[in-house]
Amino acid sequence: MRLESWSPGLTHLRTDGTAHMVDVSEKVESTREATLREQFVQLSEVLLLLTSDGLPKGDALAVARISGILATKKTSELIPLCHPLPVSQATVDFVLGSDRVQTLCKAVKTRGVTGVEMEALTAVSVAALNLYDMFKAIDKHAVLTDIRVLAKSGGKSGDWDLGTSEEKA
């Protein structure tokens, strides 16, 4: 199957449909940054335990934060076609609501030739998975939802912010 007619923007696919790692050796190095969020909907009782350090496995937010930061550094090992990047900064924070925890990867930064969206996506995903692991004995109905890129900057494609984009969903 030839793909050039419908997938000119899919850089990880050759025209015959096989996957390959994109050659970034000729790209110009620049500062790259990405910001993401994820929602974790759960029982309010779990959130009460979370804020009072009452979870059986310990401090869930600390574990999730560190796991998210570590995930940024391991992205190329988990996502085969991602280039390994020197991560300069990774910030993972949480906003507690009445029935949800919002995981925010406020900044993943690098100085390199490719973006850090995949590293930020991996950070919020792994942080959320760690929260789920720590809550699952109490709330089996928790839902991970709405993982999305909020903003990115740097590189040839320039800056993008969901808050100012016409592509809001």
Swiss-Prot record:
Keyword Metal-binding tagged: no
InterPro entries, per the entry: MoaC, MoaC_bact/euk, MoaC_sf, MoCo_biosynth_MoaA/MoaC, Mopterin_CF_biosynth-C_dom
Pfam families, per the entry: MoaC
CDD domains xref list: MoaC_PE
Pathway stated in the Swiss-Prot or TrEMBL entry: Cofactor biosynthesis; molybdopterin biosynthesis
EC id: 4.6.1.17
The keyword Lyase is annotated on this UniProt entry: yes
Keywords: Lyase, Molybdenum cofactor biosynthesis, Plasmid
SUPFAM superfamilies tied to this protein: Molybdenum cofactor biosynthesis protein C, MoaC
Group of enzyme by EC: lyase
Disulfide bonds: none
Catalytic activity reported: (8S)-3',8-cyclo-7,8-dihydroguanosine 5'-triphosphate = cyclic pyranopterin phosphate + diphosphate
Binding positions (substrate): 81-83, 118-119
Highest taxon listed in the record's lineage: Bacteria
Function: Catalyzes the conversion of (8S)-3',8-cyclo-7,8-dihydroguanosine 5'-triphosphate to cyclic pyranopterin monophosphate (cPMP).
Family annotation (HAMAP family): MoaC_B
Protein family per UniProt: Belongs to the MoaC family.
NCBIfam families recorded: moaC, PRK09364.1
PANTHER family: MOLYBDOPTERIN COFACTOR SYNTHESIS PROTEIN A
Assembly behavior: Homohexamer; trimer of dimers.
Record's protein name: Cyclic pyranopterin monophosphate synthase
Native organism: Paenarthrobacter nicotinovorans
